[in-house]
């Protein structure tokens, strides 16, 4: 009990009458451009990923350096902020 060819033809004819050929052509052109842009972006992303893998190994793949037990050599990045002021001081 699928869609018969006659039913499909009638639906397409109604869509053509409602939207008109010019509007359907513009929508088709816009959809085609969007699909082409998406495919181009996917190709660029894959090429960029391949180049990135060849140029530099990631930091996670490098063997870890020996850690010092005293804690020397550890740096915490950030900005120093002022101490909060007491609002109730006289």
UniProtKB/Swiss-Prot annotation:
Q: Which Pfam families match?
A: TatA_B_E (PF02416)
Q: How does it assemble?
A: The Tat system comprises two distinct complexes: a TatABC complex, containing multiple copies of TatA, TatB and TatC subunits, and a separate TatA complex, containing only TatA subunits. Substrates initially bind to the TatABC complex, which probably triggers association of the separate TatA complex to form the active translocon.
Tell me where on the tree of life, at the top rank, the source sits.
Bacteria
Entry keyword set: Cell inner membrane, Cell membrane, Membrane, Protein transport, Translocation, Transmembrane, Transmembrane helix, Transport
Q: Where are the transmembrane segments?
A: 1-21
State what this protein does.
Part of the twin-arginine translocation (Tat) system that transports large folded proteins containing a characteristic twin-arginine motif in their signal peptide across membranes. TatA could form the protein-conducting channel of the Tat system.
Region (Disordered) residue spans: 42-90
Chief location bin: membrane
> What protein family is recorded?
Belongs to the TatA/E family.
Note whether Membrane occurs among the keywords. Answer: yes
GO cellular component term of the entry, any? TAT protein transport complex
Q: What is the lineage of its organism?
A: Bacteria, Pseudomonadati, Pseudomonadota, Gammaproteobacteria, Chromatiales
Where in or outside the cell is it found?
Cell inner membrane
Q: Where is the composition biased (Basic and acidic residues)?
A: 42-59, 70-90
One annotated GO molecular function: protein transmembrane transporter activity
Q: State the name under which the record lists this protein.
A: Sec-independent protein translocase protein TatA
NCBIfam families, per this entry? PRK02958.1 (NF002813), tatAE (TIGR01411)
What's a GO biological-process term for it? protein transport by the Tat complex
